[in-house]
Regions:
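N-terminal mitochondrial targeting presequence
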Residues: 1-56
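Catalytic or ion-translocation cores adjacent to nucleophile or general acid/base/metal-coordination motifs
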Residues: 109, 366-380
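N-terminal glycine-/serine-/threonine-rich phosphate-binding loop
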Residues: 38-108, 307-344, 364-365
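Structural beta-sheet core signal
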Residues: 108-110, 265, 367, 466
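Short, T/G/N/S-enriched strand-turn elements that build extracellular solenoid repeat scaffolds
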Residues: 122-123, 356-358
Length: 544
């Protein structure tokens, strides 16, 4: 006869032991008669400033006025969009309608602050409803600029990629992270002006960052950003809150929706549940709490067009037609040679963007725009114009066959992660060590750094090329021994291209080597125009 192990007999008897009635201790007997101290509910409210969310009710609201009616003063608002593209103007106008007595002291987080009397957060800042902004760039908002410099509003300026990652981290429940962006800059030191008094004197600065070393490289610790309310514009939304975005409107929309305690989406089209294929959804409905119809028109910040007959599938601009080569054209022509077949490239505004015009048709490059495009094409014709497709300079552009669009966190992950082969930027100053200054001149209006600090954050993987005129407007050299302007990045530039010559930079040794000269230019002429010391390559050649 088989005998069961004692452990088995104990397990078999366990249910009976658990469910049998036994006398309770007196203290537990007292608790048994008291009402429970918990309850299940469909209502969710995490922050005192965040409106309550009732999961049992429909997400559809009659209009924007109803959807923003319970936003509290002092709330943090995450406002999606890039420039004027993808901005939730219907919701912003409804918030403005409530007025500064009902809705005030707001902290607003966005990439830009819009344009006065046109669109974006400018409606709220002009109305005195915003106390603090967290943005990467002021843009063309003169009224906000004046308000900032006279103490009317506090502005925390943050590198664009860092801003996007702080928001993404907030939505993912990650309190902080380390980034190579902005090491050795005013951002790291906590010296970016944030608050002025009425006389225009700086009375407040940004927060100093913690610096830590990983693998021999230094990184800054950045804290996550979350909001009480996110306001987002989407192209199509179903009644469950699933969203579909068009092109570059998704720059900040999806990540902000995930980082807020309550998300309101204004939709150009509201459709029944089941309309979308699951593969087509950009933002799942779990992140959306309220849906309203979008009634505000789309705005275009910088309308750029090309003529029908000059359409090109390999450039973002049209090359100059003059027979005389200007300084800018000479620089752009040489910069184009840095763009090799199959490369993924990011081009800054101005001369760097012009370089794309001189890439031969036989060379295929993929242009990346940090607001969320890979495969950017030329300016559109009037027929091709689409307000939802813009570049990092807020200009209207097109997409080439094979292009993709994505949010800003994805975009700057490509950049910081070293997946971009070449980044070409302009400069105010470049040092012999490859230090770059290109976003701020002390004493002049400071509009922000945008994405420049992110673009130079991984020079070991992404080649950073500076394309700039050799001399500044005041006649001083831009090629210096040491930068005296605030740095965008330290030891990050590998090649410098000017109208006079080309320098290769040894970032480790802090040395410049003259490798090419423009026709008709002498070494002595280059020395006279260059503050930094440099060596001359034994293989010095003509700049083509």
């Amino acid at each position: 006869m088989d005998v069961l192990p004692s452990s088995y007999r104990l397990l078999a008897a366990l249910p009976a032991r658990i469910t049998s009635r036994r006398p309770l201790p007196s203290q537990l007997r007292a608790l048994r008669t008291s009402p429970p101290q918990w309850r299940f509910t469909n209502i969710r409210a995490i922050s005192a400033s965040a409106p309550k969310i009732d999961r049992s009710k429909s997400k559809l609201f009659k209009d924007a006025d109803e959807a923003v009616a319970d936003i509290q003063p002092g709330s943090t608002i995450l406002s999606a969009g890039f420039g004027l593209c993808g901005v939730a103007d219907t919701l912003i106008q409804a918030m403005k309608k409530r007025g500064p007595k009902s809705l005030h002291s707001l902290t607003a987080v966005s990439n830009n602050a819009g344009i006065e009397d046109v669109g974006g957060l400018a409606h709220l800042t002009k109305n005195g409803q915003v106390e603090k902004l967290i943005i990467s760039f002021l843009g063309n908002n003169k009224a906000l600029e004046k308000q900032y410099l006279s103490g009317g509003i506090e502005i925390e300026l943050c590198p664009q990629g860092t801003l996007a990652e702080r928001i993404r981290a907030g939505g993912a429940g990650i309190p902080a992270f380390y980034t190579p962006t902005a090491v050795d800059t005013l951002v790291a030191e906590g010296k970016v002006p944030a608050k002025f008094n009425e006389e225009g004197k700086v009375v407040g600065y940004g927060k100093k960052r913690e610096v830590r070393e990983f693998g021999g490289k230094r990184y800054l610790m950045e804290e996550a950003l979350t909001g009480d309310v996110a306001i987002v514009r989407a192209a199509r939304v179903d009644e469950a809150g699933n969203c579909v975005f068009r092109y570059t409107t998704k720059a900040f929309g999806p990540i902000m929706a995930k980082a807020a305690r309550l998300t309101i989406v204004e939709a150009e089209e509201i459709v029944p549940i089941g309309t979308f294929d699951a593969n087509d959804i950009d933002l799942p409905g779990i992140f959306v709490d309220r849906i309203v119809p979008s009634t505000a028109p789309k705005n275009i910040e910088v309308k750029k067009l090309r003529e029908e007959e000059s359409a090109s599938t390999s450039s973002t601009t049209n090359p100059p037609s003059s027979n005389k080569i200007s300084s800018r054209e000479r620089i752009a022509r040489r910069a184009a040679k840095e763009l090799k077949h199959g490369y993924y490239c990011n081009l800054g505004v101005g001369i760097p963007t012009l370089a794309a015009s001189f890439v031969p048709p036989s060379i295929k490059v993929w242009l990346q725009s940090e607001n969320g495009i890979l495969g950017m094409g030329p300016y559109p014709t009037e027929r091709e114009l689409d307000a939802d497709i813009i570049n990092a300079g807020k200009e209207t552009v097109t997409l080439l066959p094979g292009a993709s669009t994505f949010d800003s966190a994805e975009s700057f992950g490509m950049i910081r992660g070293g997946h971009v082969d070449v980044s070409i930027l302009g400069a105010l100053q470049v040092s012999a060590s490859g230090d770059l200054a290109n976003y701020m001149v002390p004493g002049k209006v400071f509009k922000g750094m945008g994405g420049a600090m992110d673009l130079v954050s991984n020079p070991e993987a992404t080649k950073v090329v500076v394309a700039t005129e050799h001399m500044a407007k005041d006649g001083s050299s831009k090629i210096v021994g040491e930068c005296n302007l605030p740095l965008t990045g330290a030891r990050c530039v590998s090649t410098i291209i000017t109208e006079l010559c080309v320098f290769e930079v040894n970032r480790q040794r802090g040395r410049l080597t003259l490798t090419e000269m423009a026709p008709g230019v002498s070494v002595s002429q280059v020395r006279g125009a260059t503050d930094a010391k440099f060596e001359v390559s034994p293989d010095l050649r003509s700049m083509e």
